[in-house]
């Protein structure tokens, strides 16, 4: 986008590097917020907004990253002044930041998130055009649409857990505290993902009958032991 808009090779490279580091401030965002599979409440939203300032503070202290920090500091601003953290508007937002804002939004829209399915390219472009002059610089949007319409997004682009470490991070939301088995929320999440991917799947349903009676006769601690043992046998 920057190249198409006549920016120098040095500026394009600077913006590219800033794009890689633009969310580095999220290293201080708690997983309970960052990975939450649902809408954030007001406090959580306020806390996640802090990642912009944290990212700027981290990078601006390193001479070779200072220019990148200036770009990153504005990547959640809106063209109409309703963004954060500064409420900057129009040309108060650095030009390279205005490009990053559009590119970042397109990336977010076309990536499968733990809490939200992705849009296809046409849907994302339609939303970007609808927000031209509000969230986005109209001049940037005009060029971005031309570039982004030619992009093909593979189905594999997502933010879903792949490694064992990532799966353990997500366990906060999706594992039962007693048995460590995946819970009903995880089943809902899987079904939602499969519907987005339009891929067939099948499930085995196993019922454990009369657990209430077992708890009544032996106590809930023994009932929990039975549940854990049952889960171990099924894994």
What kind of feature is each model-predicted range?
Residues 37-41, 172-173, 216:
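A short, mixed-charge helix-start or loop-turn motif at secondary-structure junctions
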Residues 1-165:
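Histidine- and acidic-residue-rich, metal-dependent catalytic cores
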Residues 101, 202-204:
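Protein kinase-like catalytic core scaffold
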Residues 2-5, 15, 168-176, 181, ...:
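A conserved signal-transducing helical linker
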Residues 150-178, 189-193:
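Signal-transducing coiled-coil/dimerization helices and immediately adjacent hinge/linker segments
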Residues 174-175, 180-202, 209-234:
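Conserved long alpha-helical elements within nucleotide-processing catalytic cores of c-di-GMP signaling
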Residues 21, 205-208:
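Alpha/beta-hydrolase
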Residues 106, 208-209:
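PAS/PAC or PAS-like capping segment
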């Amino acid at each position: 986008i920057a190249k198409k808009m006549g920016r120098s090779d040095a500026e394009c490279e600077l913006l590219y590097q800033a794009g890689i580091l633009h969310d580095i401030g999220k290293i201080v965002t708690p997983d309970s917020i960052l990975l939450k599979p649902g809408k954030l409440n007001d406090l959580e939203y306020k806390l996640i907004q802090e990642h912009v300032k944290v990212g700027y503070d981290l990078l601006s202290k390193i001479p070779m990253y200072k220019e990148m920090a200036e770009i990153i500091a504005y990547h959640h601003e809106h063209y109409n002044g309703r963004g954060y953290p500064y409420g900057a508007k129009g040309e108060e937002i650095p030009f390279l930041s205005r490009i990053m804002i559009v590119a970042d939004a397109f990336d977010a829209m076309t990536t499968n998130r733990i809490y939200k399915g992705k849009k296809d390219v046409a849907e994302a472009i339609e939303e970007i055009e609808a927000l031209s002059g509000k969230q986005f610089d109209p001049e940037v949007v005009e060029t971005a649409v031309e570039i982004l319409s030619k992009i093909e997004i593979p189905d594999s682009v997502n933010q879903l857990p792949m490694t064992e470490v990532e799966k353990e991070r997500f366990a906060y939301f999706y594992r039962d505290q007693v048995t460590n088995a995946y819970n009903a929320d995880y089943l809902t999440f899987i079904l939602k993902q499969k519907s987005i991917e339009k891929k067939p799947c099948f499930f085995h349903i196993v019922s454990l009958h009369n657990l209430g009676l077992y708890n009544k006769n032996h106590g809930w601690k023994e009932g929990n032991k039975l549940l854990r043992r049952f889960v171990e046998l099924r894994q």
